[in-house]
From Swiss-Prot:
It comes from the Bacteria. ATP binds at residues 124-130. It comes from Escherichia coli O9:H4 (strain HS). Keywords: ATP-binding, Carbohydrate metabolism, Cytoplasm, Galactose metabolism, Kinase, Magnesium, Metal-binding, Nucleotide-binding, Transferase. This is Galactokinase. The gene is galK. Its EC number is 2.7.1.6. The record marks 28 as: Transition state stabilizer.
Amino acid sequence: MSLKEKTQSLFANAFGYPATHTIQAPGRVNLIGEHTDYNDGFVLPCAIDYQTVISCAPRDDRKVRVMAADYENQLDEFSLDAPIVAHENYQWANYVRGVVKHLQLRNNSFGGVDMVISGNVPQGAGLSSSASLEVAVGTVLQQLYHLPLDGAQIALNGQEAENQFVGCNCGIMDQLISALGKKDHALLIDCRSLGTKAVSMPKGVAVVIINSNFKRTLVGSEYNTRREQCETGARFFQQPALRDVTIEEFNAVAHELDPIVAKRVRHILTENARTVEAASALEQGDLKRMSELMAESHASMRDDFEITVPQIDTLVEIVKAVIGDKGGVRMTGGGFGGCIVALIPEELVPAVQQAVAEQYEAKTGIKETFYVCKPSQGAGQC
């Protein structure tokens, strides 16, 4: 049963009438450009064919009812006429409440809604299950009430909800790619202007995501520390963000910076340059150059930004040994566990899967999860 069928059927059973719309918003994987988003830099993600799906209908009152199919059909109810505050017990409900609350601040011309939510974006893996939920909820209200909001505004609203209501300091990339993804393309995103450029993916190349299953937590983890170190670096150069610092400027005065901050800054500056170059390499189908750029990105995350863990480095090495320069591989996401992403010629996918199955668990004691994905369309009706 598809997520659409599942949520529609649950909706009819729970609420006693049929849903009028079903909306999806995808998860994402970032091909290159890690921790650059909150430094006003560039990222190169693609939406993937794992998504959050919501079957929904407008109500004729001011009540919101939300059922979470993936959490034992837990039900949250709240009113649009009372202050929206955090739910005492359900963390998932806070993503919904946060999106609705921030949408009210943007455009308060919507009424109540019934929703049933289900998703297959792996949680806690760095594939943006939370952003896909935020964008899906925003798109539901936009579609049901014909709100004059575009994808970028729905994405910004989701980011605000996560930063201010949920309390996780995320950048804008995750929500933006979920809202604006394009089938068979990656999206080069300028995180300052929010300008996007669709970059066609080479034919015959699979986007493979391998979850290390090494558990990580982003809220309250090292993520916020890295963000502070980057802000310290930008202040040193008297710039609003590291986006505005050149590698030449950095090299001239790197010795004056705190050594740890210097390493963090160097990662951001070199990663931005790699990301812009990767977009043109991908468009030209130059997998050899893409392979080099992804390898440099991983080394920079490991040595300068220090966000990889031994399990992730092991996964990258196993994949690299199989694909050589025929494809690229690197850690993706916030770090400290999570996933690696690889661009792999389709004919090499079985060999990679076999090598990982034979070696990863033997070396780490953890069993990986392997996903072969397609670059997919952003949020909309399904």
